[in-house]
């Protein structure tokens, strides 16, 4: 079916809403529901064949996230990530004013080291509620710290960065996808730090007490030391050959850079970890975020049906006809923020919103900066990812066991999200004007 069909697009959006409703109300896997709706709408209403809908399965993104999760899952299973976090906390026990920022660094480290945001957020939330809050840190500062592990995961090999990089490449920006992903990671990191600092002063994080009774963490085991070395080696080969190719060039470095794709390196790293007996492979495989992968696949398939029905044309035409060019990044941020408020953040929202970007750039005659528009979608989804109705926010709330604190969290987390969206909107508007 060619052209634009507004009715089909509306049906797809209803399908997304129903998938979210069925997930929250009946605990039905959102990705499976979305796949079913993709088949119903694609085959019965658009005249597609079943194999056409199956072809919309996001194989590249699915494979990337799986490979990353398998490799970095070794460090989660054998306790390497936990020991790294505890050692960083122990270092600040006599400097209580540094506790919040050490937790922030732990969050970034967990994200950069490949820990998936829900798992990293859960680790950070446990530390926040068991160490920071008893020391006088406001729970809402701890909520803002969740943005550190999310932003850390935007690094190219991170759980979210792999999705961002792959989806940007799918939109016709394959040559620029790597640079765009690094820029999005850098800007998101800066904005996240700014928001955490703002929350630190709003809720008086400088008044924290000294952490008492904290035992010195155990030293790294042989397996954990080997895991850290292996992670550093993988990161080295993922980054350095590309840098050398840029500055030196040559066929060997070009071929090496092509081979040193993060997903290939992660699979090689997983095999090496297996032979070094760093963790039980079956346990690592079981820890792989299969639910998130199925969710991502289902939403991507349903939104691909919507794209084929003309969703991108409808939204881009409305935005370009109604919104001034310099304000488009802000509205893309609002769109990402709204969608992420009730779903799984980047993994769900970015694949939905990313296809709009090329159409906006084309309709503007190339005056709009594609990276800024991709960044806008990421920041919007990023900041409302701590909404109490979103996965990240729900995980954070679930780690709290104090009923008196629980009463503040729902409205408080929404305030933190609002602060983030406003801050992100201001920065995006400036970037939209400057770039």
Give the location of each predicted region:
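Hydrophobic alpha-helical transmembrane segments of multi-pass integral membrane proteins
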Residues: 94-135, 140, 146, 322-378
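Small-residue-rich segments of transmembrane alpha-helices in multi-pass membrane proteins
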Residues: 38-45, 97-101, 152-157, 292-306, ...
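Hydrophobic alpha-helical transmembrane segments
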Residues: 9-14, 32-35, 97-105, 119-123, ...
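Hydrophobic alpha-helical transmembrane segments in multi-pass integral membrane proteins
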Residues: 159, 236-240, 299-316, 361, ...
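Long, contiguous bundles of hydrophobic transmembrane helices that form the permeation core
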Residues: 1-9, 13, 40, 186-284, ...
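Short helix-coil transition sites and intra-membrane helix breaks within transmembrane domains
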Residues: 26-30, 60-61, 73-82, 111-123, ...
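Membrane-core helix-loop-helix motifs of multi-pass transport proteins
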Residues: 130-220, 369-376, 393-435
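Hydrophobic transmembrane alpha-helices of multi-pass solute/ion transporters
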Residues: 2-93, 240-323
